[in-house]
Amino acid sequence: MQEQYRPEEIESKVQLHWDEKRTFEVTEDESKEKYYCLSMLPYPSGRLHMGHVRNYTIGDVIARYQRMLGKNVLQPIGWDAFGLPAEGAAVKNNTAPAPWTYDNIAYMKNQLKMLGFGYDWSRELATCTPEYYRWEQKFFTELYKKGLVYKKTSAVNWCPNDQTVLANEQVIDGCCWRCDTKVERKEIPQWFIKITAYADELLNDLDKLDHWPDTVKTMQRNWIGRSEGVEITFNVNDYDNTLTVYTTRPDTFMGCTYLAVAAGHPLAQKAAENNPELAAFIDECRNTKVAEAEMATMEKKGVDTGFKAVHPLTGEEIPVWAANFVLMEYGTGAVMAVPGHDQRDYEFASKYGLNIKPVILAADGSEPDLSQQALTEKGVLFNSGEFNGLDHEAAFNAIADKLTAMGVGERKVNYRLRDWGVSRQRYWGAPIPMVTLEDGTVMPTPDDQLPVILPEDVVMDGITSPIKADPEWAKTTVNGMPALRETDTFDTFMESSWYYARYTCPQYKEGMLDSEAANYWLPVDIYIGGIEHAIMHLLYFRFFHKLMRDAGMVNSDEPAKQLLCQGMVLADAFYYVGENGERNWVSPVDAIVERDEKGRIVKAKDAAGHELVYTGMSKMSKSKNNGIDPQVMVERYGADTVRLFMMFASPADMTLEWQESGVEGANRFLKRVWKLVYEHTAKGDVAALNVDALTEDQKALRRDVHKTIAKVTDDIGRRQTFNTAIAAIMELMNKLAKAPTDGEQDRALMQEALLAVVRMLNPFTPHICFTLWQELKGEGDIDNAPWPVADEKAMVEDSTLVVVQVNGKVRAKITVPVDATEEQVRERAGQEHLVAKYLDGVTVRKVIYVPGKLLNLVVG
């Protein structure tokens, strides 16, 4: 064994061994308990970043630990390979998205291997290959036949620069998340999948997810947004149709003083024919964002349409306004306004001088003061005719019943959740498998024409999708009739909604899933990824699983038993202000810093001499230029060091602050482990351990070894507090470093301890542990070694600490055998100088003894 720890030598050697032996390839095995450990698949952007490394290290630690428990562990990886960045990169680099993507995959695959992740590479998949997306296309056509897919015109967030539709979440401050262009609203025909048909099940089944973070479940509950209320119909004077609104607060209905409709509502359009001000307002609304977060903060504006609706219970005429906070896509495109008891309605009414009528008493029973704001709390009704004096629940039911009896109301359950718009006007995505025949009939692409293959040899102009620009691509024939293919492609959330299931049978050619394999591995036992995916990906992931279940492919209701959301990786961020007044962000690698005695940064400059402003720790990002390249760190310290730091620096679900000093500390620790094994093995063979022949000191050390095994097992397995597991191993290592190594049993005990340490560290630092296991002559490869088991007998304490009090005041702490009697403890206590001093010449009137813990002598 060489004396120095040289990770660059051992890591490549061990990785080659894993590759040649196919160590992590698995097949279904009914004789073993399965464990499916999955990290969210990466987008092949070109290089791994530290967020990836953290995510995949956590997954690999769990997978390797479960493997050592003897389970049949599946840990696959693949590539979420479609998407917009590839198009931008292709234009920039004068290539096509496909070669750019495949080059990135090859590069990042090597980076993953360099980090020593134990993946089953035989199951690797890339979502941009026809072998993958053909099954998604087939499934979509089946959903269409089931009535779960439809096409409709819909107002969307349109990025004029990228020429694509953006999801609400992709609109940041009214601009495109990717290119910062101002977003417009546009009506275009799009394909939708009816996720709303599963709204109740998606909501109710959250209760089954005991091992998902409550934050994620709450976000999904709010996103689905189930509410119970009443749909109310209003007659409108001089208008051919009625207006329908939905409210969750029918108890406030007597305070409804105006209605508001969306700018795109037919009533507003009709009114605009003779109203130039309204027509201009409608035009302005076309460029309003449709993201709810934006709508909540934007200025509320409106124009009176001139129409009057009739309040069904009071007969009063109330104005109908067109307002920018009402959307056609949400509900009926019309809302009732109760400005006395809704803050948004109150602000709008105050701005435009509309009537504000209070109908709910304040908590103290007085009339509410509405001079500054609305009273939004529930309470007792007044000013409401026959409903006066009713509380919220009674009023809700009484008004709902009356409206129903009159034929102008109906109780309804509503959802905030909208159907999933899956059309994208981009090139680099899976083609949507629908065709339009010459006679206008729209139908699914026949099975014998699937997959609809995306041509990869294309020229990108950065504006129009090549399959839209080429009129020949869309032409096809169905049933002998000319037809045109759909030129939109799928939202890339489609591919990432079912990849986890395809990993169970990636080579299966008969269909989307091999049910036998899928049902062996599914559900996923632990799914690891960022909390930013809580409502988009993780909701579609659950939805797709239920669709596949209802298609008879899987048996389970939910795709993953446990969800672990890892924290972000933060790093120092620095900038200087350039001559143009803009911030120039400087990489922390290039910052020369001065620190105070507490280690805080007080001054910084770069190599060019710029004084730098230190903004603290923030998420590693390109925009702040504070990303640290994992490859550089691996080349400098080795993969094991990077992995160990990642798992030690912070609990897995908390933010991790990147500190190179911490990385150096992790490296020093691994050098100490190496040195101890080197010194131990240099002394030659070891005798067998005789636990009956150990001295008290040896027993104490062995007790520490087995207590550490018990703690680390609990920390990794049950608590998933990996940082405390590592801390416990480090503490044990400090004790082992000081332990005597001269005697035969000293060395036998050290052998047992080191074999345990190396196995406990193996999930975190597999390369060094693989090597040290061989040097310690462990049986076989460590990859097949069992997890160490704590010896209960070894952990039993021979002695215990008893606190001795005289008249309730602590006078001594004594160590006694665990089986000592009360008399023996009293005798031992009497030998203590301080105790004897207080007993001299007095009578012990009472003795309180708590076995093994406390002796209190009451004297007088």
Swiss-Prot record:
It is an enzyme of class 6 (ligase). InterPro entries: aa-tRNA-synth_I_CS, aa-tRNA-synth_Ia, Leu-tRNA-ligase, Leu_tRNA-synth_edit, M/V/L/I-tRNA-synth_anticd-bd, Methionyl/Leucyl_tRNA_Synth, Rossmann-like_a/b/a_fold, tRNAsynth_Ia_anticodon-bd. It comes from Escherichia coli (strain SE11). A motif ('KMSKS' region) lies at residues 619-623. A motif ('HIGH' region) lies at residues 42-52. One of its GO terms (biological process) is leucyl-tRNA aminoacylation. GO terms for molecular function: aminoacyl-tRNA deacylase activity; ATP binding; leucine-tRNA ligase activity. Belongs to the class-I aminoacyl-tRNA synthetase family. This is Leucine--tRNA ligase. GO terms for cellular component: cytosol.
